[in-house]
């Protein structure tokens, strides 16, 4: 067990410094592997097929299919690392073929009318702001989320040099340290960012982060959630809105406008187009709603 614990520590360091994985991904790996380590320490675990299947059976009793798949993938990747480093002769998970029926959960989106109300409340708040940070920072977060479709974590980790307003683009470091550029096509959003950058140039240069809070510290995920909640409340929006829903809405609305799905894939930073295709289901629902309302056959009635 001692060796296994040491190998896990080495593997997590490799994930951090060699693979450049997202801290949240590494945290999930750490939790999954610690859980597996606990089981391996309870008895003389031999990593045979039967013992591994028994472990997976235990997971089925506690978790949903999506979580089980992630945990298995974490352990499988770990043993792949051990095999590559010559620490084990064979990856006991490599030949396992486990099919899990994972329900497709469609992304939750925000109607454009609701987004408009939220942005309107932010503009109104800007006009009545008591401090400069409130005035210049009011629109930046929600506006950028919807204008670019970035993840909240990507927004919060934007460096000062990553935001290139003269070129109208931002450089994003996505999952797996993958780099991409996203353009800001809306002049109002660009204008708001220009005002913010000019007002806080010294602060954000010193901080290194482009988005800072009133204490001049890098913006956190929780801060963004609080900002979204605030403007939803001011706009009278009763439904639960999360920052990530702006990303879902960004992708779905572009699809509805006929934008090529491969371009949307690049904007979102998805490694596989299969991930992006989930939005076609949401856009398809919108198309059905339009047909129900607008199709001429529905206007023909028989006595």
Residue ranges and their predicted role:
Residues 1-303:
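Conserved catalytic core of the tyrosine transesterase superfamily
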């Amino acid at each position: 067990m001692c060796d296994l614990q040491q190998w896990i520590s080495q593997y997590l360091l490799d994930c951090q410094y060699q693979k450049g994985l997202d801290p949240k991904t590494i945290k999930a790996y750490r939790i999954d592997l610690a859980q597996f380590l606990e089981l391996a320490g309870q008895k003389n675990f031999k990593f045979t097929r039967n013992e591994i299947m028994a472990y997976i059976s235990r997971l089925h009793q506690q978790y949903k299919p999506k979580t089980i798949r992630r945990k298995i993938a974490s352990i499988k990747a770990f043993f792949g690392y051990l095999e590559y480093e010559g620490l084990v002769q064979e990856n006991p998970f490599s030949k396992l073929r486990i099919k899990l029926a994972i329900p497709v959960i469609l992304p939750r989106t925000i109607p454009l009318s609701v987004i408009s109300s939220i942005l309107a409340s932010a503009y109104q708040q800007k006009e009545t702001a008591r401090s400069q940070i409130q005035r210049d920072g009011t629109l930046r977060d929600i506006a950028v989320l919807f204008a670019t479709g970035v993840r909240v974590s990507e927004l919060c980790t934007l460096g000062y040099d990553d935001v290139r307003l003269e070129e109208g683009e931002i450089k994003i470091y996505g999952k797996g340290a993958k780099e991409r550029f996203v353009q800001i096509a809306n002049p109002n959003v660009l204008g708001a960012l220009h005002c913010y950058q000019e007002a806080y140039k010294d602060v954000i240069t010193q901080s290194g982060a482009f988005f800072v809070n009133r204490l001049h510290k890098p913006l956190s995920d929780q801060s963004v959630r609080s900002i979204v909640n605030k403007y939803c409340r001011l706009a009278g929006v009763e439904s639960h809105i999360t920052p990530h829903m702006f990303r879902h809405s960004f992708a779905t609305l572009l699809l509805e406008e006929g934008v090529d799905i491969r371009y949307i894939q690049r904007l979102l930073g998805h490694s596989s187009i299969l991930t992006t295709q989930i939005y076609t289901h949401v856009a398809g629902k919108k198309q059905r709603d339009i047909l129900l309302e607008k199709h001429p056959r529905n206007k023909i009635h028989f006595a």
